[in-house]
Amino acid sequence: MASCCENSCAVDALHGKQRSTLIKVLWINAIMFIAILAAAFYGKSTALLSDSLDNLGDALTYGLSLYAVTRGPTIKARVALFKGVLIFIAASLVIVQIIHRLVNPVLPSYEVMSIFSIAGLVANGICLFLLWRHRNEDINMSSVFECSRNDIASNLSVILAAIGVWVFNSGIPDIIIATLLAAILLRSAARVIKGALSELA
């Protein structure tokens, strides 16, 4: 009986730590989504737009993960599957914007891109640090960690895009990086969906 109680307390403690971490990273991503989305439209950057949609997807993902923390493996797998679908939708929106920019080219602001991609990198670095200890605990937390890791790559890519826009005085580097980010999102969506489906099988 004591052993059962200890196990139950340990599980409750783990869920409490997961919930606390998810609340923190949810707020960070929600704030960064609003800031980077505004910057993307102001700076006319498709790469920044993809970055902001990534933050929105993560904020929604963390909200869903909060729901799944105390649920069983099947519910967690279903939530992970939904996360994968959200990532896929974000990638699709980026692809639509890329096509729009190819048809209607503009020169993005490399200053805006640089400032907000660096701010995003710092914010997502904090999120990754907070999520690191939870990355192998279950399918729910591993899929959350996957999202956060993608954000770091996304921010670094936008910084490279900003440098490219500055050096070449062209919007093409922005489109190239946005395309790469869309590919990363699609790959991540496939990985999360595959993992969730294997859990549900």
What are these regions (language model features)?
Residues 1-201:
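Alpha-helical transmembrane cores and adjacent cytosolic helix/loop segments
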